[in-house]
Amino acid sequence: MVVKFTKSEALHKEALEHIVGGVNSPSRSFKAVGGGAPVAMERGKGAYFWDVDGNKYIDYLAAYGPIITGHAHPHITKAITTAAENGVLYGTPTALEVKFAKMLKEAMPALDKVRFVNSGTEAVMTTIRVARAYTGRTKIMKFAGCYHGHSDLVLVAAGSGPSTLGTPDSAGVPQSIAQEVITVPFNNVETLKEALDKWGHEVAAILVEPIVGNFGIVEPKPGFLEKVNELVHEAGALVIYDEVITAFRFMYGGAQDLLGVTPDLTALGKVIGGGLPIGAYGGKKEIMEQVAPLGPAYQAGTMAGNPASMASGIACLEVLQQEGLYEKLDELGAMLEKGILEQAAKHNIDITLNRLKGALTVYFTTNTIEDYDAAQDTDGEMFGKFFKLMLQEGVNLAPSKYEAWFLTTEHTKEDIEYTIEAVGRAFATLADNK
């Protein structure tokens, strides 16, 4: 059992003197789980982390999804090392970027053409620009609670109803930008139709997480994505899939392959970089030809397509092509789901568990979670206590009730068995302190 965080606490105190909030992304802070110093990790290998105090953890954070092959996978590490030895940045075309683009196209047939960028935020931001250029329209639709990066246009909350325009979800986002965004509930065809009836003639595109990963793992209802395509295309707008989390996570060809629904544009990130910074976007040839130098929609990047990220991404996809890999993730996910539910029943802890293959979310509620409102109405205080108990047990989760547990190819049945036992001990403590 982990009992000391002395060095993490000291490091966080020092970090507060030099780094805003002591972290380089707010999701790493422990603010959402009752506060305290976040645990600072020193190294990772396979499914495990070791922190600066020497404590070992089974890792289900997986860097919020990208580390599907585990930490320091030898094939990926070798590719990165070779790329570094050859020079990490040229500012010129390379053979690696062509090879990687071909691999992405082969995996996802909806990608006639692709372009590499440096993050998922950039990828989404640029698909919006391209959609606006192609349609000549300005407004964007999105689903409530779905995170699409931190660019101004997507940091927008819902208005007072489905036919109202959005409001800024962050300081520094002008109201004028928020007025270009319509936010509707996920999994609700009627409100989508109502919004399109009012604003459809001004909408350039709708942003869709085909499987939600940002208020937990939430699947679309049967037929929902097909209806989104139908209604949005009837309005003359485009469908953009944000597959930054989902691509290569649940299936090699992404959520669009798993679900059998095809978007006009796709944004990628996370997993495709093998742990290095990356993003990509792509789609139909006639739409992508809006992008400079062929078309009027400008997008550029000094680091885009850099050899290190390309080599890492190629190596990651080569690992993910191994036979039986996704079946293993599903098998371990099912084992973990069954064990957590059994422990919840044993200790009389109310939870709802959403799982798809090797990713799951534990919500402290008895309600079904199909949209953001339901996810919001869950017990965050209880989750915060659970999170810290699991940390003491040597199990690393994301410090937010909205995030997923991500399995990697390196987790074992023994890891799952230990995790279930740890969940049982945590639930027992929560039950004793009700």
UniProtKB/Swiss-Prot annotation:
Its EC number is 5.4.3.8. Its main location: cytoplasm. HAMAP family: HemL_aminotrans_3. Homodimer. GO terms for cellular component: cytoplasm. InterPro entries: 4pyrrol_synth_GluAld_NH2Trfase, Aminotrans_3, Aminotrans_3_PPA_site, PyrdxlP-dep_Trfase, PyrdxlP-dep_Trfase_major, PyrdxlP-dep_Trfase_small. It is found in: Cytoplasm. Belongs to the class-III pyridoxal-phosphate-dependent aminotransferase family. HemL subfamily. Keywords: Cytoplasm, Isomerase, Porphyrin biosynthesis, Pyridoxal phosphate. The modification N6-(pyridoxal phosphate)lysine is found at K270. Its cofactor is pyridoxal 5'-phosphate. The keyword Transcription does not apply. Pathway: Porphyrin-containing compound metabolism; protoporphyrin-IX biosynthesis; 5-aminolevulinate from L-glutamyl-tRNA(Glu): step 2/2. It is an enzyme of class 5 (isomerase). It comes from the Bacteria. It catalyses: (S)-4-amino-5-oxopentanoate = 5-aminolevulinate. This is Glutamate-1-semialdehyde 2,1-aminomutase 1. One of its GO terms (molecular function) is glutamate-1-semialdehyde 2,1-aminomutase activity. One of its GO terms (biological process) is protoporphyrinogen IX biosynthetic process. Pfam families: Aminotran_3.
